[in-house]
């Protein structure tokens, strides 16, 4: 099975790494592609973007980086289309993840919020 996991924060990286370990224990042939951090990368799979590139806090910082944020959404959608996962698992990071989930649902891709 092919899994696409999106964790945009350090806490999501921790939860994502534990989830990936559990997935791989049950399905050693699982293909995992993810947005996360070092902990998830240490488990395996393919890191697309590190959460350090995604973390913008506060209203002003979000506004100043709006072009980057929208660009990341576009990169994510293109990567999902290329990878063609069986399911996408979202870990926190609601501002980004809910946009991707709404789009993916229209395409018939299974969505899971962790």
Predicted feature locations:
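Active-site and donor-binding regions of nucleotide-sugar-utilizing enzymes
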Residues: 4-114
């Amino acid at each position: 099975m092919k899994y696409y996991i999106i964790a945009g924060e350090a806490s999501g990286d921790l939860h994502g790494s534990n989830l990936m370990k559990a997935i791989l224990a049950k399905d050693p042939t699982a293909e995992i592609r993810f947005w996360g951090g070092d902990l998830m990368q240490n488990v395996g799979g393919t890191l697309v973007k590190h959460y350090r590139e995604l973390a913008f806090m506060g209203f002003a910082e979000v506004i100043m980086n709006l072009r980057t944020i929208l660009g990341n959404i576009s990169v994510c959608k293109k990567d999902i289309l290329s990878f063609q996962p069986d399911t996408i698992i979202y870990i926190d990071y609601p501002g980004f993840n809910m946009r991707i989930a709404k789009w993916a649902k229209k395409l018939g891709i299974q969505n899971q919020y962790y």
